[in-house]
Amino acid sequence: MKYHRLCIGYDKPGFETFDAITQLLGVTPEPWEKHWFGPEKPDFWSYLVVSDDEAPYFDFIDVFLDLLEPKLDALLRLGVEKESISLSLTYLYTHQCALGFDAQEMLRLGRSGFGLSIDCHEEKDTAQ
């Protein structure tokens, strides 16, 4: 199972910015929930796409960059800073975690200035 996430942080917590990012990007974000020690209002926005290992490859880097690049100036006007935008992949694997990325995709990501994080976690067989 793979969890592809686009995260956008912003300095002024509030639903106004959260809703503006949602409208601007045109995708449904993960619902915001207040955490025990977190702020009373959202200070980040995230979009999640889940795919299983049998699903066709989801090119999350290009898909997320296609969402962000044409809207970057508008995001910056909302108070988002480039450094607070990141893409992440969490991969739950059974036998091996092997990931590869296209060189052009990596160049594009590097030029964007957005962060990338990858977490791999082995799924434990609970059928024993």
Each language-model region and where it sits:
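Acidic (Asp/Glu-rich) sequence patches and key acidic residues
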Residues: 1-128
